[in-house]
Amino acid sequence: MGYVRMRRAAIALAVAASLLVCATAGAAEPRPGITFAAVGDTMLGNSPELPADPGTYLDAVKGQLRGEVVFGNLEGTLTDVSSSPKCGGSSGGSCYAFRTPPSYARHLAAAGFTVMNDANNHSYDFGKAGLEQTVAALHDAGIAQTGLPGEITVTKAGGEKVAFVGFAPYSLTASLLDLPAARKLIRRAARRAKIVVVAIHAGAEGSDAQHVTGAEEHYLGEDRGNPRKFARMAVRSGADLVLGSGPHVLRGMEIYRDRLIAYSLGNFSGFHNFATVGDLGASAVLHVSLDRDGPFRS
């Protein structure tokens, strides 16, 4: 009897082990997350002061600009238009109008960039013609662009559709000062893609603007919005990742409803056109992985 019981027990264990192996073999492996690399304010000079070799200017950081999406805020234009309506026909002095040749778009692409945000205070530095040339140059280089009024840019990453919407406190961009309109635009983006990334060019500027106040922020008398209020509204409306730029310093991050908000990624590249004294010289490349339905993974 003891032998029979033991034999039956052994058979039962063997069957259970076999079922466990089959179940494990049949279980689907977790799908990898979608990877992003993101940086803040980016330009490769300001004509006529340009790098001697623009093709190698970003070589030292190329290895960090790796992800299924590589994102930056284009703090300037890609144009050969030389007259700036913003500065009364010229740039310099206390008026800042930034441009590099349209051909520089290919250097951004070679460095790894796949998406650039144009919703900022420099996208119209050289008027409508300058902006149109910028958009065309990015397109020709294979870089997606976002940030114009009502614009939703959809790309693919990791086999999923990813929508980008850029906001800044200006009427010539998708405005972050009009919360109802912004909410509608983000919801539209969420209906068009699995993942929604919202870029915000918001908040005060300078070394004393490192902290998110939770209130309306201003710079030189200009309303730069309430970054925290806007970013959290964006998440509630469907954003899965919020990427901030504009203050020219690094700011904090938070996880809100399982979504990452990076309030400012600081200065990334300026070729002597950004102040880099003290905290203004701190930069970063943000590496993020999101689950395929949006939540922050790592």
Where are these regions (language model features)?
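Bacterial N-terminal signal peptides
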Residues: 12-22
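A general, composition-driven signal for non-globular sequence regions
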Residues: 1-2, 195
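Bacterial N-terminal signal peptides that target proteins for export
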Residues: 2-13
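Acidic, metal/ion-coordinating pockets
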Residues: 26-298
